[in-house]
């Protein structure tokens, strides 16, 4: 690809009077590359050869004057050179490992392909895209930025000292990560799936650029599929509700409080309980207390995930589930579980593409959106999800999504029965959901958000 963008080429026109845009860009690129590697070429005694080789090529194309003009322009215009260097600098994407069943690594591949599609240079940490380089080899070169997906490594001192931006998609509640965000500067962009996570990081760690940018989904080509043998599917694990993790009376009170207030965040619940008990503590003690409640909070998540499914199963609604964790389900309606082998990411997309309804229960993301929601919408199924502030704002209930309230789960079985009985309603919602998700919630959209931020 040409190093010069259209605006840079136009700037060159103003100097040279050239009207052939493609040719002008070509020779501006050659001139830029000469200046970029001038020190190395000089050191190896090859600069003169390179200049004459390019001049000979320009002569053969009848463009000698153009080449000379572009070379002089780039040699004498440091501002133009710097602009092109910034515009053509690569992103460095941290690919990660197979944590979370490979989902985070999948995200890294998705954003990489979207950036390349948009004309960006990309280097990946595993060498799967771009050139294979060591970080030590690029430290002194300009990067447009690092991109990671909950990449803890980007918070190490080595990266903190680097001046380029670090764009880090963040999915889990920051309360689980202690002081990881302490002392980060304005080169860090925390792209949180939940607005409350961004506010938490900003409030307690002083982050300047914590904002909401949820993950996106993949269109695997299933939206038009009419053969949907699965009525309602849930792709997720069956987790234990283990009340033995509750260590003292205060933790028990907190646990019971959150069970009866399922629409607030963990930190909101703690603040309310402290006010109710007339306890006044400083910020550090609050964070320490919240940190001590991690296991209790996970228990609350597991309690409501189980309760959502149990509500449907007990009402006689069959649910297709995947993975051997469901062998331990002992709640009501267990005979209505249809158990299958575990599935990977690609198989999950196919399952949703063969389903009428995809069920989603949040991991306590009260103002967020997950890739599961986007993937269900892009698969042609109806996404039936626990409501969040983000979904309330960005989607329309019974138009392109169907949401339910954890405080009123008694209504959920009738919602499912209506969707399964009313083909036209279900298909209309699914179609609208696909249109919306394909316009707003694919990785091309997230890549564009990062580029606009630059």
Which role fits each region the language model picked out?
Residues 1-105, 110, 114-118, 122, ...:
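Non-catalytic N-terminal targeting/anchoring module and adjacent flexible stem/linker
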Residues 3-18, 163-167, 187-189, 207-211, ...:
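Active-site regions of enzymes building and remodeling cell-envelope glycoconjugates
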Residues 4, 80-81, 94-204, 218-223, ...:
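Extended catalytic core of nucleotide-activated donor transferases of GT-like folds
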Residues 6-9, 24, 175-182, 200-204, ...:
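Short, charged, surface-exposed secondary-structure boundary motifs
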Residues 13, 123, 147, 167, ...:
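Hydrophobic/aromatic beta-strand patches that form the interior of the parallel beta-sheet core
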Residues 45, 50, 57-90, 94-107, ...:
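Nucleotide-sugar donor-binding catalytic core of glycosyltransferases
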Residues 93-95, 106-118, 123-127, 183-185, ...:
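Catalytic binding pocket for nucleotide-activated donors in carbohydrate/polymer assembly enzymes
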Residues 159-173, 250-259, 372-380:
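A short, gly/pro- and small-residue-rich
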């Amino acid at each position: 690809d040409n190093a010069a963008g259209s605006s840079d080429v136009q700037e060159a026109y103003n100097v040279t009077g050239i009207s052939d845009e493609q040719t002008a860009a070509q020779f501006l690129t050659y001139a830029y590359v000469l200046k970029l590697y001038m020190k190395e070429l000089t050191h190896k005694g090859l600069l003169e050869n390179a200049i004459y080789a390019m001049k000979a090529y320009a002569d053969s194309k009848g463009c000698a004057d153009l080449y000379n003009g572009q070379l002089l322009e780039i040699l004498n215009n440091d501002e133009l050179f710097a602009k092109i260097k910034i515009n053509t600098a690569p992103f460095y994407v941290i690919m990660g490992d197979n944590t979370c069943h490979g989902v985070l690594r999948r995200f890294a591949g998705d954003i990489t392909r979207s950036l390349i599609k948009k004309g960006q240079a990309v280097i990946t940490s595993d060498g799967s895209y771009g050139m294979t380089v060591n970080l030590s080899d690029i430290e002194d070169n300009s990067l447009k930025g690092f991109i990671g997906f909950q990449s803890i490594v980007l918070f190490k001192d080595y990266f903190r000292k680097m001046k380029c931006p670090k764009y880090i998609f963040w999915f889990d509640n920051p309360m689980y990560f202690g002081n990881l965000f302490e002392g980060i500067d304005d080169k860090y962009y925390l792209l949180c799936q939940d607005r409350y996570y961004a506010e938490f990081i900003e409030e307690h760690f002083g982050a300047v650029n914590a904002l909401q940018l949820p993950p996106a989904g993949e269109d695997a080509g299933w939206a038009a599929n009419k053969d949907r043998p699965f009525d309602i599917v849930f792709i997720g694990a069956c987790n234990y509700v283990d009340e033995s993790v509750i260590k003292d009376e205060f933790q028990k009170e907190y646990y019971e409080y959150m069970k009866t207030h399922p629409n607030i965040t963990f930190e909101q619940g703690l603040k309310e309980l402290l006010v109710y008990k007339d306890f006044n503590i400083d910020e550090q003690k609050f964070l320490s207390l919240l940190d001590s409640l991690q296991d209790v909070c996970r228990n609350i998540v597991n309690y409501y995930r189980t309760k959502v499914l149990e509500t449907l199963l007990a009402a006689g609604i069959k649910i297709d589930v995947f993975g051997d964790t469901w062998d331990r389900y002992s709640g009501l309606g267990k005979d209505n579980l249809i158990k299958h082998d575990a599935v990977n990411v690609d198989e999950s997309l196919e399952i949703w593409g063969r389903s009428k309804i995809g069920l989603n229960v949040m991991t306590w993301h009260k103002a967020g959106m997950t890739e599961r929601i986007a993937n269900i919408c892009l698969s042609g199924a109806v996404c039936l999800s626990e409501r969040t502030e983000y979904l309330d704002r960005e989607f329309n209930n019974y138009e392109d999504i169907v949401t339910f309230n954890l405080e009123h789960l008694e209504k959920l079985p009738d919602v499912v029965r209506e969707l399964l009985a009313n083909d036209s309603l279900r298909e209309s919602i699914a179609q609208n959901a696909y249109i919306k998700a394909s316009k707003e919630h694919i990785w091309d959209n997230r890549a564009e958000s990062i580029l606009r931020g630059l």
